[in-house]
A protein has these predicted regions:
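Conserved alpha-helical "signature site"
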Residues: 1-145, 149-157, 163-216
Length: 216
């Protein structure tokens, strides 16, 4: 039944969480101020806490003073990192696993994998890929497995799938790139990111021109 739903497109896409949407819309204004972004961030305590934690991490601090308020955190991290952190939080909000069981393990494994891919994508773009923005590569890494999150959450209604992990993995492999593309397009992300989400499993991908974010 789940395979039929996916194949005929009869599935409801999740809404883009409100705080991430407001951050993204504000950042579309090239003249947006740190104060305006800070006001949006402060409306979501979890996002505020996460930004403070990242700003005070060993990678970001580098001998600087401890960041104690959201405005300082935004100034240290930059707008793109704020956007990516809001998207990461949006994924956590949109795809909350149950407290226990195989679905939770699958979701948590996918979440850890997405973070690793995001970090590696950032490093590769910064060091190797001329023309690919590191922050865009990081965002794409965070989103590349979003279809997998969605299918896993739908699979909760079919508990027998978790008794046959090979069948579930087959569904995930076949459908998560296309479902992921549908979600990121519905959420209004750029075409380049949608293509990367759709084609990230195509290891022999070939195209004219320089490397793009899908190649990363």
């Amino acid at each position: 039944q789940l395979a039929r739903d996916l194949s005929d497109g009869s599935f409801e896409l999740p809404a883009f969480p409100d705080v991430a949407l407001r951050v993204r819309e504000a950042l579309n204004d090239a003249d947006v101020s740190v104060d305006k972004i800070a006001r949006i961030v402060l409306s979501e305590p979890v996002l505020s806490a996460r930004l403070l934690r990242i700003a005070n991490s060993a990678m970001m601090r580098r001998g600087s003073l401890e960041v104690t308020d959201v405005r300082m955190a935004i100034s240290r991290l930059g707008f793109e990192m704020v956007r990516n952190t809001a998207v990461s939080l949006a994924l956590d909000s949109a795809f909350k696993p149950p407290a226990h069981g195989p679905l939770r393990r699958q979701i948590e494994n996918t979440r850890r994998h997405s973070v690793r891919v995001a970090v590696l994508s950032y490093v590769l773009a910064k060091r190797l890929a001329d023309g690919v923005k590191p922050d865009e590569a990081m965002l794409t890494g965070l989103l590349h497995a979003i279809g997998r999150f969605y299918i896993l959450m739908r699979a909760e209604a079919f508990p027998e799938l978790f008794e046959h992990p090979d069948v579930l993995e087959g569904l995930l492999h076949d459908w998560h790139p296309g479902v992921g593309r549908a979600i990121v397009e519905a959420w209004g992300f750029p075409d380049g990111i949608a293509v990367a989400v759709d084609e990230h499993e195509v290891l022999d991908r070939d195209h004219a021109g320089r490397a793009d974010v899908a190649d990363i």
